Amino acid sequence: MERREEQPGAAGAGAAPALDFTVENVEKALHQLYYDPNIENKNLAQKWLMQAQASPQAWHFSWQLLQPDKVPEIQYFGASALHIKISRYWSDIPTDQYESLKAQLFTQITRFASGSKIVLTRLCVALASLALSMMPDAWPCAVADMVRLFQAEDSPVDSQGRCLALLELLTVLPEEFQTSRLPQYRKSLVRTSLAVECGAVFPLLEQLLQQPSSPSCVRQKVLKCFSSWVQLEVPLQDCEALIQAAFAALQDSELFDSSVEAIVNAISQPDAQRYVNTLLKLIPLVLGLQDQLRQAVQNGDMETSHGICRIAVALGENHSRALLDQVEHWQSFLALVNMIMFCTGIPGHFPVNETTSSLTLTFWYTLQDDILSFEAEKQAVYQQVYRPVYFQLVDVLLHKAQFPSDEEYGFWSSDEKEQFRIYRVDISDTLMYVYEMLGAELLSNLYDKLGRLLTSSEEPYSWQHTEALLYGFQSIAETIDVNYSDVVPGLIGLIPRISISNVQLADTVMFTIGALSEWLADHPVMINSVLPLVLHALGNPELSISSVSTLKKICRECKYDLPPYAANIVAVSQDVLMKQIHKTSQCMWLMQALGFLLSALQVEEILKNLHSLISPYIQQLEKLAEEIPNPSNKLAIVHILGLLSNLFTTLDVSHHEDDHEGSELRKLPVPQGPNPVVVVLQQVFQLIQKVLSKWLNDAQVVEAVCAIFEKSVKTLLDDFAPMVPQLCEMLGRMYSTIPQASALDLTRQLVHIFAHEPAHFPPIEALFLLVTSVTLTLFQQGPRDHPDIVDSFMQLLAQALKRKPDLFLCERLDVKAVFQCAVLALKFPEAPTVKASCGFFTELLPRCGEVEPVGKVVQEDGRMLLIAVLEAIGGQASRSLMDCFADILFALNKHCFSLLSVWIKEALQAPGFPSARLSPEQKDTFSQQILRERVNKRRVKEMVKEFTLLCRGLHGTDYTADY
C-alpha cells in the first residue's frame, strides 16, 4: 500500500527525500498540480497524490481537507480520497468502525448540502460506496435510512437543500453500483436488495414530481434520480406512475431533456417486454406527443423533435415483437410505426437541418426481423399490413438520401459532408435489408419510377431525384444477386439516357454499373451499352475512384467477353496513366484492371499489349536508374515498381483464380510456352538489379522490388519456375548487403511454393542457408534494433519446417544457433515478433523424431526454451500472448514428454521462479496439470492463463474478470 521509497517529492521537491502524507504536503502538492506551469512538476505531484490517496494516512488527512476554511479544490480531493479508500480498500476497515464512518459521512453531506456541489457529489459517491459494501447484512435498510435521515426536521440545512442532497445521494447510488468492483456473488445480492429498496424511493420521487410547489431544480433532480434507478431493471409496472409523470413533464422546456432520458431508460430495460399491459398503456402516451413533434419540426426545434423521436423509437425498437403479438391492438402499434415513419422522413437534409432521422433506421431492421420470424400464416397477415409501409419507407429513404442543391451543398463543411456520406451508407444498408421483405417488386418499383422520370416530357427532372433512385438500385445490386431480375436489362438501357451534369450523379452511375458487373458477365451483349460511359469517365479526375473501381469490376467479372474491347480499354487507360490524372492508389487499381483484362487474351496479344503498356515505364525506369538517388526520383521508382507489381498481381493466363472460384468452363485453354509475365520479368530483371544496386539501403525501394516478385509468385505459382534460380541469386546478394524484412518474406514465398520440387531445391536451399547465416550474424551484433527482420526470419523458419523439413538436415545450417536466437526472440517486447517465434517452436518441436539435428538441439537446449517460456508466463510477456506460449508447452509435452517432465520440475524448484508470488504447492499443481494434458490444447491454454494470473498477483481480482 505505502511505498515511501518510490514517492516523488511534491511541491517542487525534485530529488529531495520523499514527503510524508500530511495535510500540509497534500495541500502543497494540489497547489503544484493546479498552478505550477511546469508539466513535469504537475506529473510528479499527480503521482504523489495518487499514492497519498492509497496510503493509510488518507483516513486522517481526508477529513481535515473537508474543513470549511479549505477551498473547493482541496475539499474535493479529500472527498475523492474517502471514496477511493472505501471502494478499493474496504477490507482494511474494521467492522466496529462502519457506524462511525457512516455517521461522519452523513454529517459532511448535510454540511455540504448548502456548499460546493462537486464536493457534495463526491461525498455522496463515498457514502453510496459504503452502503453497497455494507448491504444487505450490515446495513439492511440503507436506502430507507437515507430517506429518513434527510427528512429529519432538526437539520440546520433548509428543506430544499436537504432534499437536493438526498436526491443526489439516491441518484449516485445505482450509478456507483453499476461501476463498482463488487465480486459477482455480492453484486447479485446487492442488486436484489436495491430492487426491494426502490419501494422507499419511488413514492418520494412521485410526490416531489407531482406536487405543484416543487421547484424546477428539484423536479429535474427527481427525473435524473428516476433515470438512474430504472437501470437496475426495476419492474416496468412499478415505474408506471413515474413514467406518466415524466410524460407530463415533457411539456416543461426546462425538464424536457431529463424527462426524455428517464422515459427512454425506463422503456429500454431488457426486462420491460414482460410487462405488455404497461407497454400498451405507453403507446397512447407516445402518440399523444405527435402534435408537439409536428410543432417542433415546424419551428425548427431540433432538440424537441430529436427527444420525442428517441422515445418513439425506444418503445418501437425494444418491444416490436411483444407489441406485434398483441393482435387486437394492431392499429395502435401501426399508428406508432407511422409516427416513427414521420421521424424517418423529417423534413430537411441530414445533418444540417435535422439529426433525428438517423435514429430510426435500426427500428426498421428490428420490425422486419420480427415480422419475418412469425410462422407462415401469421407472417402473411402482417406482410399484408406492413408491405405498403415498407414501400413507403423506400420512398422516404430515397428522398432523405437526395443531395441538396449544388449551391447549398457548397456551403456544407467537410465534416457535414462526411456525416451525410455515412448517413447514405446507412440508408443503403437499410434498403438492402428491406429487399428481403419486398423482393423483386422493390426493383420493379424503382425501375418504374426511374423510367417515368427519364422519359417524362412534362417537366425537367432534378439530377438529385435520378441519383437517389440509382443509388437505391446500386445498394441492392451490390449485395443481392440480381442476375434473375427482369428489370436490369431495362435499367442498363436507361443508363445511357441519363443526362450527367453533376459529379455526384456521375459517381452513382459508375458505382451502379460496377454493382451490375456480375449481371453483365451473364449478359455480355449489354457490355457495349455501358463500357463507353466508364471509359469516358476515366478521363475525369473527379470521378477517379468510381470510374477506376467500376472498370476493375468489369475487367474481373467479364474478362472473357472483353477481348473485342481490349485495344480500346488499354489505349484509354494508357492515356490517363500518362497524363497522371489519377492518384497513386487509383493508378494501382487501374493496373489490376488491366491485368484481369489481359489474362483473357491470346499470349501474343498479351505480349503486344504489355509491350505498349509498360514500355514507357521501363524507359523512365532506365533513366531513373542512371540518376543519383534523391527523394523525388525515389518516389517515381516506387510508383513504377508499384504499377508493375499490381499489373502482375492479376495477370493470370493459367486462370488460377478461376480454379479457386470454381468458375464455369468459359476460360481459355492453358497456353503453351513461357508465361508472359515471366517473359517481361526476365526482360527487366537486369534493370531491376541496376535500380537495386543504387537503392539497396532504402527499405521502401527494396520492398517495392520484392513486391513485384512476391505478387507474381502468388499469382503465377508453378509458372514462375523459370525465374527461381536468378531470383534466389538476386535475393541472396540483396540480403547479404543490407538485410531487409521484405527479402525474407519473398524467400518465404519461394520456400512455400518451390522448396518441395527437386529441380528448385538447390537454389532455394542455398538462399535459405545464406539468409540464415546473415541473420544469425545480425543476432550477434544486436537484433533488438530489427524486430521486423527477426519476425520475418521466424516466419521463414516455420515455413521451412512446414514445407521442407529437409532444409534443417543440411550440415551447413547451425541449428543450435537458430534455436538459441529463437529463444532470444521470445523475449522481444514486440508482440508480432514473439508470436512468430512461438510459431517457429510449435513447428519445430513435432519434428524432434524425424529431423535428427532438431531432436539433438531440443535435447541439449530444450531446458533453455522452457525457462524462457516460464519467464514469459511469470510476467515478462504481455498477457495477450499467453496462448502462444501455451502452444509451446503443449508441443513440448506432446513430443518431448520425458524431457519436459524432468525440466519443468527442476525449473520450478528454484525459489522465486517464475514469480515470487507463487507457493511451492501452486507450482507443483501447475507442473502436474501440464504434464497430464497431452490431448486438449484448449485446457492447456486455460491452465496457463490461470497460472499467469497467480504469477502476477491478479488471480481472483475484478481486474481480470473478463480475461
Swiss-Prot record:
Residues 45-111 form the Importin N-terminal domain. One of its GO terms (molecular function) is small GTPase binding. Keywords: Cytoplasm, Nucleus, Protein transport, Repeat, Transport. HEAT repeats lie at residues 24-54, 56-88, 95-135, 142-179, 194-231, 236-268, 276-325, 330-372, 375-438, 440-476, 487-522, 524-558, 562-600, 603-648, 676-716, 720-754, 761-803, 815-845, 860-893, 897-931. GO terms for biological process: protein import into nucleus. One of its GO terms (cellular component) is nucleus. Its main location: cytoplasm. It is found in: Cytoplasm; Nucleus. Gene3D superfamilies: Leucine-rich Repeat Variant (1.25.10.10). The keyword Zinc-finger does not apply. It comes from the Eukaryota. Interacts with UBC9, RAN, RBM8A, eIF-1A and PAX6. Belongs to the importin beta family. Functions in nuclear protein import as nuclear transport receptor. Serves as receptor for nuclear localization signals (NLS) in cargo substrates. Is thought to mediate docking of the importin/substrate complex to the nuclear pore complex (NPC) through binding to nucleoporin and the complex is subsequently translocated through the pore by an energy requiring, Ran-dependent mechanism. At the nucleoplasmic side of the NPC, Ran binds to the importin, the importin/substrate complex dissociates and importin is re-exported from the nucleus to the cytoplasm where GTP hydrolysis releases Ran. This is Importin-13. The gene is IPO13.
